[in-house]
Every structure is written in structure tokens, then in C-alpha cells.
Curated annotation (Swiss-Prot):
Record localization: Cell membrane
Keyword Glycoprotein tagged: yes
Name of this protein: Low affinity immunoglobulin gamma Fc region receptor III-B
UniProt-annotated glycosylation sites, renumbered to this chain: N56, N63, N165, N180
Gene Ontology biological process terms in this record: antibody-dependent cellular cytotoxicity
Disulfide bonds: C47-C89, C128-C172
Length: 253
């Protein structure tokens, strides 16, 4: 009969099983990658997540309501105001994704970005987009009411590395035919760089609770383990002494 595993080995086995049970989150991606669009724009939302073999069923939520589509990609052929809002998705082997916001604007221009919150050091790409891709020229990007960059022909504005100074309100303006048009103002926020060491060391509450419970069990189990080992050694020693005493008594006779 084999010996029982010591407490540390048992803890390692249970911990490995717990990690294997963790389910990854699905991820919603926009294609094109812009978080704001104009009415009648074409947008595709793609759900990245794990699927069971042969089953690509995907659940889509829009503002908390379940959509009828169960395809991995959800397409909006001509965006309307009511298409704006929060989108989430889930696959068979992935948990519910974090929300992605889509804004649908009415007007001639919209200032587009992949998102509105950036970390220091990240690149920022801004695009001045016209309704139905009408030709746009003499384009100016403005930050906090001041001209930031001018393009005679429409072009994206690239900021290679974001700093706190890039936080603020932005809009763009230009000419369509001979008409001056402007986008609505948007707010871009640049936050301090994320600390990967700190963020990776923060555990979800259920893992913290698991570690606390396993620590208590380990302490109790370890005490019991060594207590049994001590009693076993004492019992073996007493048995040897008894055998030796009996043997000596027999020789005296």
C-alpha cells in the first residue's frame, strides 16, 4: 500500500486543477477599428473566443439585450442611431467579453479613434471621416480649440507616443466642395503607464479566497500530518522497547 501524499503535494494538485478551470474572456473587435461612425457607415463586430469543435455559435448582446445573430461576426451594413451603444459577446468556451462602445453620429464629419482612453507611450491615430466618404480637403485637427495639424488633402493624424499633454478635447474641420464643415468635439484621456508587475500580481477575489482557505487547510493538515508521524514513531519505539524487555526476560529464565 502506497504512502499518502504529504500536504504540500496535495495543495499543488488542487491549485493546478483550479487554474485549469479558469475560463478566458471573449473579445469584441471593430472592423474598421473606429469607436465612432457616421450614419450609413458599414461596421463589422468580430468576436474572438474559444469554440467547441464544430460549433461556432456566438451570443451577441446589444445594450444588454440578446441579438438574434449567432455568427462569430455581427455586421451593420448601414449604421443608424439606434445601432449605437454597448456590445458584448460570448462563445461556447469563453466567458462574456468586456463591453465595447460604438457611437453613431449624424452630420458631415466625425473625428474617429480606436478608443478614447490611452496609456502613456501608446500611439494615437485620429481620422477625420466624411459622410459617405465625400471628398474632404483643407483639413485641420484641433486640440483644446487650437490648431494641431493641417493637411491640404485629408489624412490621418498620427501621434507616435502619447503623453499627458495629449489629453483634452479634439475636433476636426475641413471643406466639402465649398462648404466649411466640422465634427463634434470628443475627449481623449491619456493615463499613466500601466504597471505590469502590479497588475499581474493582483488576483481575482475568488482566487484570493481559494488561497486563504487552502492556507488554513494546509496549516491544519500539516499539523495533523506531523502529529500522526510523531505518534507513529513513539508507538514504534515503545513496541521495540517492549520486545526487547520480553526478550531479556526470557533469557533470564
Amino acid at each position: 500500500m502506497g504512502q499518502p501524499l504529504p500536504p504540500v503535494a496535495l495543495l499543488l494538485l488542487v491549485s493546478a486543477s483550479s487554474r485549469a478551470a479558469d475560463v478566458p474572456k471573449a473579445l469584441v473587435l471593430l472592423d474598421p477599428p473606429w469607436a465612432s461612425v457616421l450614419k450609413d457607415d458599414h461596421v463589422t463586430l468580430k468576436c474572438q473566443g474559444l469554440h467547441p469543435a464544430g460549433d461556432n455559435t456566438t451570443q451577441w448582446l446589444h445594450n444588454g439585450s440578446l441579438l438574434s445573430s449567432q455568427a462569430p461576426a455581427y455586421t451593420i451594413t448601414a449604421a443608424r442611431a439606434e445601432d449605437g451603444g454597448e456590445y458584448r459577446c460570448q462563445t461556447g468556451l469563453s466567458s462574456l467579453s468586456d463591453p465595447v462602445q460604438l457611437r453613431v453620429h449624424l452630420g458631415w464629419l466625425v473625428l474617429q479613434a480606436p478608443r478614447w482612453v490611452f496609456q502613456e507611450g501608446e500611439p494615437i491615430q485620429l481620422r477625420c471621416h466624411s459622410w459617405k466618404n465625400n471628398k474632404l480637403h483643407k483639413v485641420t485637427y484641433l486640440q483644446n480649440g487650437r490648431g494641431l495639424r493641417y493637411f491640404h488633402q485629408n489624412s490621418d493624424l498620427h501621434i507616435p507616443e502619447a503623453t499627458r499633454n495629449h489629453s483634452g478635447s479634439y475636433f476636426c474641420r475641413g471643406l466639402i466642395r465649398h462648404h466649411n464643415v466640422s465634427s463634434e468635439t470628443v475627449t481623449i484621456t491619456v493615463q499613466g503607464p500601466a504597471n505590469p508587475v502590479v497588475s499581474s500580481s493582483v488576483l481575482p477575489w475568488h482566487q484570493i479566497a481559494f488561497c486563504l482557505v487552502m492556507g488554513l487547510l494546509l496549516a491544519a493538515d500539516t499539523g495533523l500530518y506531523f502529529s500522526v508521524q510523531r505518534d507513529l514513531r513513539s508507538s514504534q519505539r515503545a513496541r521495540k522497547e517492549h520486545t526487547l524487555g520480553w526478550s531479556l526476560g526470557s533469557q533470564d529464565k
